[in-house]
Every structure is written in C-alpha cells, then in structure tokens.
Amino acid sequence: MNFAHSEVAALDQNTMRTLCEEYVANNYIDPETSERLGVKRGLRNPDGTGVLAGLTNVCDVVGYKKDQEGHVIPTPGKLIYRGVNINEIVDEAYRNDRFVFEEVIWLLLFGSLPNQEQLDDFCEILAEHRALPEGFMDTMNAPSPNIMNKLQRCVLGLYSYDEHAEDLSLENILNQSINLIASMPTMMVNAYQMKRRYYDKQSMFFHLPKPGQSTAEHILSTYRPDQKFTHEEAKLLDMCLLVHADHGGGNCSTFTTRVLSSSGTDTYSAIAAAIGALKGPKHGGANLMVNRQLKDILKHVENPE
C-alpha cells in the first residue's frame, strides 16, 4: 500500500463554499461581546498577559513586570524550575562539562536535584526503557508527513501494550510517565525515519540505543545514518531539552494535559492531546519559524556569525 498517495475524500469546492458561508453566518461572536462579559479570549488579558488558570510550584516563567499603573514592562526572561534558576544549571553543566537534562527531569518530578546515586539509578532506568515494545513497529509502519502527528499516534499506540493503561494510581502514572520520557526520543527518531522513506524518498536507518548515553546523545546517535556527532552538538541539544522541559504549567500543551487528566482519562490520551497542542504553529510550531528564520539569516546576511 502506498501511504504517501492515499487521500481523504473531499467535497466539491462549490458545496464546501456554501457550507462554510452558512457556518460563518451562524457561528460568530464579536470580540466586543467577549470583552463586555469579561470573557478572556485565548486565556489572555486585554494587555496580552496570561490569565491565572491554576497554581504550580514546579516551574515559573518571568518575562515582564507591571508598574504602578499596571502597564506591562518587558524584563530579561527567567525560567525557574522548582526554585532553581536554569541559568545556574547551565553554568554548572558547562563548568563541569556534563549533561544535565536527566537531572532536570528528576528535579521537575521530585522537587530537588538528585544526588549521584539517585542520578545514576535514574539514568539506568531511562536507558532500560528506551526500546519500544515488541511488535510496536506495526504502529510505526503507517507514516505521516508530520512528525508531531506521528508522535501522537505512537503515544496512543502504547496504550495497547500497557496492561494497566487505565490504572490512575500515583505509582502507575509515574511509571507510565517515566516510560514515556524514556521512549519518546526513540519514537521521534523512528517517526522521522519513516517520513524520510515514504515522503522524502530517502533511505531510512534504525539504530539500537547504546548503553551509557545521555538523552541528547541517544537522539543524535540514532538519528544520524553513521551515528556520529560531536560533543558540542550533544551539549547544545542537551541545553535545548533543558529549556523546553517545562514552562510554568499555563502554556497550551501543559494546560491541555491538565484539562484531560481532570476528566479521569488515561495517561496516553492526555499526553497525546498535549502533543497535538504543541504541534500548533502558535505554540510549539513556533520552533519551525525560528528554524526558518535562522536559515534565512544564513542565506541572506553577510558574515552571520
């Protein structure tokens, strides 16, 4: 079966135009009405600041302050994990030349930085759970031109391999979450390889995880055809993982997780929905715009370095 050329049936253009006109005519609420009734459209205040939607002691994002008149004043950004400014973590990482993403996972989950024994044990747990369940490649075989879409399906697919998928005890949810943290890079790389094969018409490569690698090293070694990467590349990716680990509990994808989990649904459904939110161009999709901007700078700016 040629997945790349299979298409979803579409209505003819005239029919769709008529239906859309009918829909728009009867499904519109003007912004003035929302403002008059105090509805926070997009969970934003009129000045663009976020709406308080919950409390968390896991992460805090500081990007502005307000003066006495309530005007928003931009300030140098701060990202604080469990009371620790990530700049301190970054300084520590470069001072001692080590990878810190695994430490940050522990910090976010358990509230404090791990000691060496805890870190070693945790890294071993992650390494043991990088591999996907036996038979899971059947799920991977249906490709997608969008890797985020494929990740959603992969996460939902793991439900079928979990005998306790609906168990909402703390022990089971934590176990599922750690397994997802460990296996997500593997699913991501495999989704990319399937996209290369079916949509980019290039060769795909599947490499087994190597013992003793950090998450950043694991991604690079399984992503590259020759499994080669520099230490500098791995450290840079480690930093990227660090700064994207959490953004305060109020961002779109985290808020989505909280909405779904509040209904009592399973872990896989909640995380898959969060990935769908992260896929949106107004949230995680902004990274693609940054990448395009960097490429444009390299192409059109003389001496960009």
Residue ranges of model-derived segments:
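Hydrophobic alpha-helical bundle cores within soluble ligand-binding/oligomerization subdomains
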Residues: 2-305
